[in-house]
């Protein structure tokens, strides 16, 4: 296998050793591609208006316009739309609680036609008014694929819904007790009425519109213009008879007789009996009849009786209809036909097997006579009770399926429809045609006749994904449709009054529709931001729920189950546990959407058994046509499939097939799983249920203080970290010019710098920012000044990343052994050292908000002047009444002082006097300050003050603005300094050695410019030098212009920033001032916290043990975590054991590298050892591209352990793990550590007694995570608190500061103990006995302990409820 020769900046620092057996032909695509592409297509912001395609916003406008007035003389046309630059950037929107959006302005024309000179054919334009009209604000997507709505980051989840088109299915025999299959068909449009066709148990075919009352299908067929004759002609073939005086002659058709039982003797032309009565007719018989030249067979009279006439039979003489189409033949009718001289008779051919008389039977129960009557019947079904006038009837029928405004199949629907009914073209009209309806009924009848197969609803060829763009477009359309109605009403006025387009269009409906969708839709979700993996997974989620989708309650087992078409499209592992299982899925790693919204997955093309590098993306329907080999199929050196039989999939079934039949091959073994599942090493050794938990729990891992890369990974870590957007990557290559904790400045390479633009990139890092889940988002630079970067290199780590790789946990030394029952039932025993070293300490940031409102009694005030508070309680507030940054606060501490006016009370004369003397105002206001909640404490890290326009800013608010501006000015100055330095460097290179025509300091013409001269001249005077060469002069001029422009743009940027900061803030109605205080809380690991590995092995910390008591190895190394070995076998997640073994090897090799560095080994020696580590097994790495310094720098990074990649389904084998263990622990180290021969177990010693445990213990390193279920957030206690209004019982839950429910079983427990008094107080004074509660409180205050239990309020509620039923119930004392 070819080694990888190019390494990025971070890879050079630490290469992950991969055990993948073959390189992936296709790189993992950008993981947020689906979201970003969909929204880009919706906005088409960067496209010139003329070049925009008819999708997204453009399609919405095209559908709504032109709007024509009722009289037809005024028209409003849409020309183009533009998107304005958003007023605030993402960060500002988050801080101010705004929506990151852009205003849409549409250019529309109001055309008024001249009534006098216009005719119905040609209209003469009287005047045209063109204007740009505001059409609401459209939220913009951030770089990370999310939206900022009202200051919070949200994600629009894609929806998996049933594709428009036609579907055929049956009820699986569930409807009728006999188990008979009832077939049905359904035409589903994108917009418009659903049309269903269904058989009932009596084999009569019905249709229904929008699930209303069912009607015989022949009514619909008549309504589309067919008469009974043409209906029968469309569905049946005819048997031709010639009537004789007695009996008849039947035309001989061999295929129709085969398999039937002869009801009479069948003779040939000569009269010879070929088939005797009651014998079955076989192919031999029909052949004999054909050979004898028989064209007609004589049939007796009773053979005709019961047959159905195929067409109307008219008496030639009188013109009277003797027999109607679909009439059954009887003796009387036959007599009538003979007397009318009818000789030739056509009846429909039916049989019991494959030619049922369903349509004929349906026609018989249909009472409508003609097309209009049929349409009236449909009108009555749709609009019961309304009088069916002719116009209304025709209009309704037309509007149901034939009007593009009300019915839209969509491109997808038409494509699916045509494919289903066997048409070749994939395009066509977006409304139904009569032929379409007829074709569907024909296929349904064929299905009932046993021809063809029903559709599989859960096949991914029948389900498509609606992305953000499409969902937003639908909302925009709804808004425009409302506008269209309003405009249509008012358009007529434009003839008389001088109205402009903006007078007619009110954008409110659009804004309302979008606001409702982005703010409250089921698919618009609060982004899960616990860690980068959670973010990326949330954006790749595909939900079957939501408007137009399924509901939890109605979704059956089949919809939730894994389907064969999920392969490579939707992850079979990652889905939530609980009621949503299988309804919310995650997109597979390589999956993408095609133009129709169906999920595609890539395959390598195989030609004559040779695997090519050509990649084709196939949708689920296309995949069914091919034979596809697995990604791990054996190949020879030339890339040919080896072996006689290859494991492959055909039509969803896995089989062994010959290599010649294979047409495609999987791209990568990881292609079937999602991002989260692909980060689980040794996934192939885990049971699916546990793998599901592992994938789900890695999304709940809390970012810790110092992230640590997983020792055993899968190779996807780097991709996931970069694509999630938490790390900072270089936009362009260059050299690092400046680094500090808050920003990185890169001087861009000359070849990547755009002419006339500043050749400097400045990356401002995020510091201590609160995420949606209150975790800490924090970026740290990982580059040094002078480092050379390429485009795309990671230059700063974010939360939960380490050197550009996702790092959601810590590598811990794990021992699998029981320890005094402390790891019973998945409990986890942890060493004190882990806590002391802050390995799992995380920072959580809480946002506390206080608002000063305008109340009826006067405005609330944020102030330091709070009644009844001591100076000690106020000493951390500044003069504006706001706490200072850096203060450490405890529960109950005041953060922001606020007073609210309270209603005037009548004062006694003494109080009036006192207030007159002392000006005491305290009694007018009550203290409503913001305080720290019970159970939380921390450090104030930031304060923000927002003031409404027109309200005086306090000193604190002004100071915050000044600080912000100062910081911004510093930033700009730094940028300018670097830009200038860069410009002067370029000028120096440009002028050095050139001839000048003159310049400052009396530079003579023809003098060569050198560095000494340039150093002697002020840099700003370099522009006065006049080079002899014109080209150099123009370059110098362009640098000068670029510099001046940059200075000017910086001044403008500063002005704009100042304007933004000093203008009033947009606050909710009635709010005058808002203060946000951010608290940072340090959470250390403690008993009760939930932890987990990546294999679904979760548990709760039971005890933190002093390090000296932990089991330790022979060389004194104590274990970090002790897990129960019983957690492995029954759970069948063996991946964790393999991870522990490989992690143990990685750590051992790291320690050997550390020993070599301590012994000051030479680079060559180190290179030799690293060659052995990286290139003895698995994928080869080309270490020769690294310089000696880079090799030593990498070695220093590997001392904590060599990171491994064991790709999903292509991971390290047992032999490879054993080789690595041998390399890590040569015999001398093995002995010293007390390892067994396999090096996977060690003899441990009891930390408390020093005795050796009897049996060896499995020990090694596992990447262990701390999950977001922290005991601090769950711990809760209450004495008194809020009560429910109706029942007067304490509320429930921590958020409401509620109590614990004393339920039925707890009551039984007290009854069992006979604790009657305890039970009484539980059911009364501690619950809802209102008088009793107050009395207990009084007696406690007095120091007494008497309890008087009264009537519980819930009893009163019960009495009231009984009264509401009309039963008078009263309590009487006995």
Swiss-Prot record:
Keyword Cell cycle attributed: no
Catalytic activities: RNA(n) + a ribonucleoside 5'-triphosphate = RNA(n+1) + diphosphate
Any GO molecular function: DNA-directed RNA polymerase activity
Coiled-coil region: none
Alphabetical list of SUPFAM superfamilies matching this protein: beta and beta-prime subunits of DNA dependent RNA-polymerase
A Gene Ontology term for the protein's cellular component: DNA-directed RNA polymerase complex
EC numbers for this chain: 2.7.7.6
Keyword Hydrolase among UniProt keywords: no
InterPro entries xrefs: DNA-dir_RNA_pol_bsu_ext_1_sf, DNA-dir_RNA_pol_bsu_external_1, DNA-dir_RNA_pol_su2, DNA-dir_RNAP_su2_dom, DNA-dir_RNAP_su2_hyb_sf, RNA_pol_bsu_bac, RNA_pol_bsu_CS, RNA_pol_bsu_protrusion
BP term (GO), one: DNA-templated transcription
Function: DNA-dependent RNA polymerase catalyzes the transcription of DNA into RNA using the four ribonucleoside triphosphates as substrates.
Family: Belongs to the RNA polymerase beta chain family.
Subunit structure: The RNAP catalytic core consists of 2 alpha, 1 beta, 1 beta' and 1 omega subunit. When a sigma factor is associated with the core the holoenzyme is formed, which can initiate transcription.
Name the record gives this protein: DNA-directed RNA polymerase subunit beta
Gene name of this polypeptide: rpoB
């Amino acid at each position: 296998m070819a080694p990888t020769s190019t390494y990025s900046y971070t890879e050079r620092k630490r290469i992950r050793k991969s055990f993948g057996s073959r390189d992936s032909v296709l790189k993992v695509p950008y993981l947020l591609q689906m979201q970003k592409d969909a929204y880009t297509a919706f906005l088409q912001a960067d496209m010139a208006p003329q070049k925009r395609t008819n999708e997204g916003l453009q399609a919405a406008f095209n559908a709504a316009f032109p709007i024509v007035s009722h009289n037809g003389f005024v028209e409003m046309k849409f020309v183009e739309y533009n998107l304005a630059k958003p007023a605030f950037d993402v960060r500002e929107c988050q801080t101010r609680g705004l929506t990151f959006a852009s205003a849409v302005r549409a250019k529309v024309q109001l055309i008024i036609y001249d009534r006098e000179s216009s005719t119905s054919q040609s209209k003469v334009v009287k005047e045209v008014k063109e204007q740009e009209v505001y059409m609401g604000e459209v939220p913009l997507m951030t770089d990370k694929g999310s939206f900022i709505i009202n200051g919070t980051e949200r994600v629009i989840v894609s929806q998996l819904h049933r594709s428009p088109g036609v579907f055929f299915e049956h009820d699986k025999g569930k409807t009728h007790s006999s188990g008979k299959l009832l077939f049905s068909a359904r035409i589903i449009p994108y917009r418009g009425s659903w049309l269903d066709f269904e058989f009932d148990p009596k084999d009569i075919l019905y249709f229904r519109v929008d699930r209303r009352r069912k009607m015989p299908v022949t009514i619909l067929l008549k309504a589309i213009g067919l008469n009974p004759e043409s209906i029968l002609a469309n569905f049946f073939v005819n048997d031709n008879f010639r009537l004789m005086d007695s009996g008849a002659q039947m035309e001989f058709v061999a295929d129709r007789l085969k398999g039937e039982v002869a009801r009479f003797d069948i003779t040939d032309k000569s009269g010879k009996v070929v088939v005797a009565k009651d014998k079955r007719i076989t192919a031999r018989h029909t052949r004999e009849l054909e050979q004898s030249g028989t064209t007609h067979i004589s049939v007796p009279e009773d053979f005709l009786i019961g047959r159905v006439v195929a067409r109307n039979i008219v008496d030639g003489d009188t013109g009277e209809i003797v027999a109607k189409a679909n009439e059954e033949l009887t003796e009387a009718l036959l007599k009538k036909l003979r007397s009318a001289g009818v000789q030739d008779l056509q009846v429909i051919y039916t049989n019991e097997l494959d030619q049922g008389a369903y349509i004929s039977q349906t026609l018989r129960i249909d009472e409508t006579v003609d097309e209009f009557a049929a349409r009236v019947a449909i009108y009555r079904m749709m609009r019961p009770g309304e009088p069916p006038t002719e116009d209304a009837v025709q209009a309704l029928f037309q509007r149901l399926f034939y009007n593009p405004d009300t019915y839209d199949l969509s491109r997808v629907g038409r494509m699916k429809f045509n494919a289903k009914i066997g048409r070749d073209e994939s395009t066509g009209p977006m409304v139904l045609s009569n032929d379409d309806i007829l074709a569907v009924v024909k296929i349904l009848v064929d299905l009932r006749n046993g021809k063809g197969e029903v559709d599989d609803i859960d096949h991914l060829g029948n389900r498509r994904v609606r992305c953000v763009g499409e969902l937003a477009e639908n909302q925009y359309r709804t808004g425009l449709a409302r506008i269209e109605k309003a405009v249509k009403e008012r358009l007529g006025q434009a003839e008389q009054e001088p109205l402009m387009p903006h007078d007619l269009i009110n954008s409110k409906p659009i804004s309302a529709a979008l606001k409702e969708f982005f703010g409250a839709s089921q698919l618009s979700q609060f982004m899960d931001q616990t860690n980068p993996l959670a973010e990326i997974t949330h954006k790749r989620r595909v939900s079957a729920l939501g408007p137009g989708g399924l509901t939890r309650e109605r979704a059956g087992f089949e919809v939730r189950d894994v389907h064969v078409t999920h392969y490579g499209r939707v992850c079979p592992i990652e889905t939530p546990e609980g009621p949503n299982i299988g309804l919310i899925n995650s997109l597979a790693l390589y999956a993408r959407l095609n133009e129709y919204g169906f999920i595609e997955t890539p395959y390598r093309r195989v030609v004559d058994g040779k695997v090519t590098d050509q990649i084709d993306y196939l949708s689920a329907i296309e995949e069914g046509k091919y034979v596809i080999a697995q990604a791990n199929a054996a190949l020879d050196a030339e890339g040919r499939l080896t072996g006689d039989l290859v494991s492959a999939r055909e039509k969803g079934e896995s089989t062994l097939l010959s290599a010649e039949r294979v047409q495609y091959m999987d791209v990568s073994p990881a292609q079937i799983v999602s991002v989260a599942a692909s980060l689980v090493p040794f996934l192939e050794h885990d049971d699916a249920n546990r793998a599901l938990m592992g994938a789900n729990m890695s999304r709940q891992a809390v970012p810790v203080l110092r992230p640590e890369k997983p020792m055993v990974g899968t190779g996807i870590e780097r991709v996931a970290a970069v694509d999630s957007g938490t790390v900072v990557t270089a936009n362009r290559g260059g050299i690092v010019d400046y680094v500090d904790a808050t920003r990185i400045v890169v001087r861009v390479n000359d070849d990547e710098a755009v002419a006339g633009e500043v050749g400097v990139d400045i990356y401002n890092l995020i510091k201590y920012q609160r995420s949606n889940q209150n975790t800490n988002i924090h970026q740290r630079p990982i580059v040094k000044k002078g480092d050379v970067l390429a485009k795309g290199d990671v230059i700063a780590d974010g939360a939960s990343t380490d050197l550009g790789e996702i790092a959601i946990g810590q590598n811990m030394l794990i021992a699998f052994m029981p320890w005094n029952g402390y790891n019973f039932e998945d409990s986890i025993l942890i060493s004190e050292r882990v806590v002391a070293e802050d390995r799992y300490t995380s920072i959580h940031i809480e946002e506390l908000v206080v608002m000063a409102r305008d109340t009826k009694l006067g405005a609330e005030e944020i102030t330091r002047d709070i009644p009844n508070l001591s100076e000690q309680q106020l000493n951390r507030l500044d003069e504006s009444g706001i706490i200072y940054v850096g203060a450490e606060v405890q529960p109950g501490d005041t953060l922001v002082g606020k007073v609210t006016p309270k209603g005037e009370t009548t004062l006694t004369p003494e109080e009036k006097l006192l207030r007159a003397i002392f000006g005491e105002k305290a009694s007018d206001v009550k203290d409503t300050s913001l305080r720290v909640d019970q159970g939380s404490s921390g450090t104030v890290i930031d304060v923000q003050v927002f003031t409404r326009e027109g309200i005086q800013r306090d000193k604190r608010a002004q100071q915050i603005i000044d600080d912000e501006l100062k910081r911004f000015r510093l930033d700009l100055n730094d940028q300018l300094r670097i830009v200038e330095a860069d410009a002067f460097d370029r000028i120096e290179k440009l002028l050095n050695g050139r001839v000048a025509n003159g310049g400052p300091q009396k530079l003579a013409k023809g003098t060569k410019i050198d560095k000494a001269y340039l150093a002697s001249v002020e840099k700003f005077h370099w522009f006065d030098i006049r080079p002899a060469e014109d080209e150099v002069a123009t370059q110098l001029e362009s640098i000068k212009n670029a510099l001046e422009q940059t200075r000017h743009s910086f001044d403008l940027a500063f002005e704009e920033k100042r304007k933004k900061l000093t203008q009033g803030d947009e606050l909710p109605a009635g709010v005058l001032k808002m203060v946000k205080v951010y608290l940072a809380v340090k959470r250390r690991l403690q008993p009760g916290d939930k932890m987990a590995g990546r294999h679904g092995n979760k548990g709760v910390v039971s005890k933190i043990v002093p390090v000296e008591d932990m089991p330790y190895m022979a060389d004194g190394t104590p274990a970090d975590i002790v897990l129960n070995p019983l957690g492995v076998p029954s759970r069948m997640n063996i991946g964790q054991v393999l991870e522990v073994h490989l992690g143990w090897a990685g750590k051992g090799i790291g320690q050997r590298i550390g020993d070599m560095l301590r012994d000051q080994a030479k680079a060559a020696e180190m290179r030799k050892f690293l060659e052995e580590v990286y290139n003895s097994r698995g994928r080869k790495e080309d270490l020769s591209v690294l310089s000696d310094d880079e090799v030593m720098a990498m070695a220093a990074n590997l001392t904590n352990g060599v990171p491994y990649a064991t790709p999903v389904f292509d991971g390290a084998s047992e032999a490879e793990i054993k080789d690595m263990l041998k390399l890590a622990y040569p015999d001398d180290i093995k002995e010293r550590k007390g390892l067994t021969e396999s090096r996977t177990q060690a003899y441990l010693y009891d930390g408390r007694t020093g005795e050796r445990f009897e049996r060896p213990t499995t020990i090694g390193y596992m990447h262990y995570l701390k999950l977001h279920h922290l005991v601090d957030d769950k711990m809760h206690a209450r004495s008194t608190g809020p009560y429910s209004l109706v029942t007067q019982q304490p509320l429930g839950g921590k958020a409401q500061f509620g109590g614990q429910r004393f339920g039925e079983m707890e009551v039984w427990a007290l009854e069992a103990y006979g604790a009657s008094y305890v039970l009484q107080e539980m059911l009364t004074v501690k619950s809802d006995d209102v008088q009793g509660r107050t009395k207990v409180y009084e007696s406690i205050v007095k120091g007494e302990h008497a309890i008087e239990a009264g009537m519980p309020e819930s009893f009163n509620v019960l009495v009231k409820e009984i009264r509401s039923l009309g039963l008078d119930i009263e309590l009487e004392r006995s």
